């Protein structure tokens, strides 16, 4: 059985709806293989909830107008499509949006049962004039990907007064990825996969990635079932990159190194603290233009984080180091 470095996955949270996931080290070429598979799965196969049809009292079709309502039915349908819904109910169900009098009709005015949440409650659905009455039923279902209004119409929603809606089930808004070179031990040709995931408020990015991973495991498992004893690559334990140590994911830009030391390391392809720990002092000194003072500087910075170079004794004494070196 071939043994490979075990990749680690670290989440860098950008906001409540956006995270950056770093997976490394991956065998050469696997960054693009995994990145493309995850991106496609995230955009097309994550379950979500959406409105499939609406029924507005007194309205027979989407080209109607409603007395006392600023928006026509077509505009209301467009607003309904922007609803962000999370649902724990597997079967189709109907909710009601009822409001009277002058003012805005908001998404948070929808009467939802337990297990249903509206993620963008401030979304304006319609604007009412004085004495106007707005009474709308919304049918909500769970699904995946995108289903057109025409498809919803063909699926049995052509009853009088029922207006089908384009259903955007996917809770994932945007996914991008890039692949960089990274180091593992003495090899520098491994892949680092960086995936940027932005979701709707109905799901956390980490949950979306977990769902995509589960889906891919199920699909790839079909191939494995052909011969469960077939030889493959086994991922060993990579002691260089403990998942619990966030310090190892600190970019070298954040270490406060001198310009000379920083430039030498970047030219060598070193980007994170975890990669520095794969070097011995002599290996650093072998880098072009990287002298003893640069090596001492790096050891001092690592010691501040509680780490040391490969083969070095922890607790580097940097008391003699000149902090103005290389500036």
From Swiss-Prot:
Per UniProt, the keywords (alphabetical) are: DNA-directed RNA polymerase, Nucleotidyltransferase, Transcription, Transferase
Q: Which species is this UniProt entry from?
A: Tropheryma whipplei (strain Twist)
Q: Which GO terms describe its biological process?
A: DNA-templated transcription
Q: Where is this region: Alpha C-terminal domain (alpha-CTD)?
A: 244-327
Q: Does the keyword Cytoplasm apply?
A: no
Catalysed reaction(s) here are: RNA(n) + a ribonucleoside 5'-triphosphate = RNA(n+1) + diphosphate
Q: Quick check: keyword Mitochondrion in the entry?
A: no
**Protein name, entry field:** DNA-directed RNA polymerase subunit alpha
What Gene Ontology terms describe where this protein resides (cellular component)? cytoplasm; DNA-directed RNA polymerase complex
Q: Where is this region: Alpha N-terminal domain (alpha-NTD)?
A: 1-227
Read off the domain note: The N-terminal domain is essential for RNAP assembly and basal transcription, whereas the C-terminal domain is involved in interaction with transcriptional regulators and with upstream promoter elements.
Q: Which Pfam families match?
A: RNA_pol_A_bac, RNA_pol_A_CTD, RNA_pol_L
Example GO molecular function term? DNA binding
Return the InterPro entries for the record.
Answer: DNA-dir_RNA_pol_insert, DNA-dir_RNA_pol_RpoA/D/Rpb3, DNA-dir_RpoA, RBP11-like, RNAP_asu_C, RNApol_insert_sf
> Which EC numbers does the record give?
2.7.7.6
């Amino acid at each position: 059985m071939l043994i490979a470095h075990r990749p680690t996955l670290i989440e860098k949270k950008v906001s409540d709806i956006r995270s950056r996931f770093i997976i490394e080290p991956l065998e050469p070429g696997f960054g693009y293989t995994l990145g493309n598979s995850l991106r496609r799965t995230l955009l097309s196969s994550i379950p979500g909830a959406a409105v499939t049809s609406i029924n507005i009292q007194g309205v027979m079709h989407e080209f109607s107008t409603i007395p006392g309502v600023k928006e026509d039915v077509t505009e209301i349908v467009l607003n309904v499509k922007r609803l962000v819904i999370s649902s724990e109910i597997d079967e189709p169900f109907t909710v009601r949006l009822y409001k009277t009098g002058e003012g805005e009709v908001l998404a948070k005015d929808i009467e939802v049962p337990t297990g249903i949440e509206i993620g963008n409650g401030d979304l304006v659905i319609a604007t009412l004039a004085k004495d106007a009455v707005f009474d709308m039923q919304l049918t909500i279902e769970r699904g995946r990907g995108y289903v057109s209004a025409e498809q919803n119409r063909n699926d049995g929603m052509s009853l009088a007064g029922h207006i089908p809606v384009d259903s955007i089930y996917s809770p994932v808004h945007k996914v991008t990825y890039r692949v960089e070179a990274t180091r593992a031990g003495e090899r520098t040709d491994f892949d680092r996969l960086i995936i940027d995931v932005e979701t709707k408020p109905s799901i956390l990015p980490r949950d979306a990635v977990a769902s995509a991973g589960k889906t891919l495991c199920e699909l790839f498992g079909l191939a494995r079932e052909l011969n469960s004893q077939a030889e493959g690559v086994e991922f060993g334990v990579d002691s260089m990159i403990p998942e619990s140590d966030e310090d190892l994911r600190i970019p070298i830009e954040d270490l406060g190194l001198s310009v000379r030391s920083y430039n030498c390391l970047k030219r060598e392809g070193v980007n994170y603290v975890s990669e520095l720990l794969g070097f011995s002092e002599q290996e650093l000194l072998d880098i072009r233009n990287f002298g003893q003072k640069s090596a001492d500087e790096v050891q001092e910075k690592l010691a501040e984080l509680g780490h040391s170079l490969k083969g070095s004794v922890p607790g580097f004494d940097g008391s003699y180091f000149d902090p103005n070196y290389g500036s």
